[in-house]
């Protein structure tokens, strides 16, 4: 995932929402009246929850502690709730199932169930329907896969009756949501449906019910009705992001509410699986087909300008939804024709292979691919062709991810992302079939107009953002060539989902100029496509680059070109080197744009840092010379001249960041710099504050690794003290988590030893400064 600027200061929206929601719910705080941490709990272990498969894949790679906490919560809930885990599966990549083809419905359900099983170590009992979008065929797909239940909104019930009775009762959106219902299906199968409490769910999402945990608890408890004679289940359903992302500290309100409910006589927490096992349906229901919880017009939000949006600008419309879906439907159908035709040449049963391809998606190892090919490939089938066909189908599913239609404009990042998926379908379909499909897709995207005139149409967005970002092996080789000028690689390097093997490498310098010449093999870890390239890249300083990439010619030709370049690479020979590069590598010229987006930013940042380092001494001299004048201005409350203020801010922030980068930081020097910043009225910028938080996190991890090391404890305690004294607003969540766990696991042994008085004093002081309540204050 590349940088998403709108998620700043985080790298992307997954990272931001993980920080604001997914991670906090795994370590939710319960506070006392002094806002000290009384307890840290994993909300996921108490409530039913679901994560999409693609999000879990990202969490496993990018936020492993949070990912493991989610898996552990399900394991704990299996013990807590009589063998029924809290985790619920989801249709694979959150497509609107009623708008999908029958085949895609079943693949989405099967892939979602299989992904769940491999992650959580058990088969799913329940499955969340994306946006609760439902029709009978979707329920059939769930039942075929052995799913026992799903959850819907009350208005999605058409009518209900008690089992064994003849007469149906119209639901009208008001059926009893405190019991499960059986939905009989045309196949003879059945599936249980829970209907969540709509008013309370809406109050949580939109009416500030999460402002206080006791308010949420009282509202939930108030939903029980003594008139009902059956065992009642009060259940609500909301977007998970509600708890922390949409409503800050919502995870704390939830944690406190759960604690209050657990201590209420006559009431206990449960999950859907346990409740269903203990209280099977005594009533049946029929659904209103093609409905969803987030559209009052059925499922039109994902294919037409129905009026549902997220607060569009005045005069905006969503007429772009229809041509977008029509274009993708056309592409899906063309991809299916190609898949069946070309797949029949390499696969025993192409569609059966697609159903099982989830095993390869979850495990890309050579062994996994070999097992898959043994089951499905015809003798002599070309591996890359097989994988490209199946990847084409995977992206044809991904391009229907529901958020692509949910929001206000076709230019939003969610819609642009599904266009990227469509672009990958085009790339793979054209490669395996040798047909030309992209011009037709562009024509079909042209009627999808953005509400922002400068963004044009979906066609223009595709041309501007999808086509230039398209990857192939040559683009990876170009990226590698440029990056090799700035950093060192081993002979085998991983570049995202590609593997680059270096056959030959030579670097020459002439003054500031640097020339890298290489012969490499690039291999896709996804499709196993492989090609060899020859690279030559010349860095002339700052962002000036020359060179290029060409398909390998090998042998004497490569040796001759390398010899010519290295011979000319000397002072005064740079113009000749550039002419040689143009002559031999001019077809694919290199520039900073050859880098993938994240590396573009990183390299440019490094170049800027290098430039700033040259200017740093000038700023420091200016700052040091006028330091007494700055202090006097600050003491007298007189505004500091802009040039001096800028010099002071630049110099002090740079020095503090540099000190924080040491392991461990030199604490006396750090205190002195912070005092100087205070005396001169200098505010620490965001990067310095984040560096301070990162230093505390690293110090807490060093202490966790060696809890008996008094120096490490002292360093951490002092660092936190310095931050508090400087009144820095820091995120100390991870340091608090480690402290909380260590107090239970380490402190008792130190105390029992009888010779840890200094350690205990420092440790307890650290707890106070991390705002953790004393051990005696924490309820057992």
Describe the function of each predicted region.
Residues 27-32, 378-390, 498-504, 653-659, ...:
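Short linear interaction motifs
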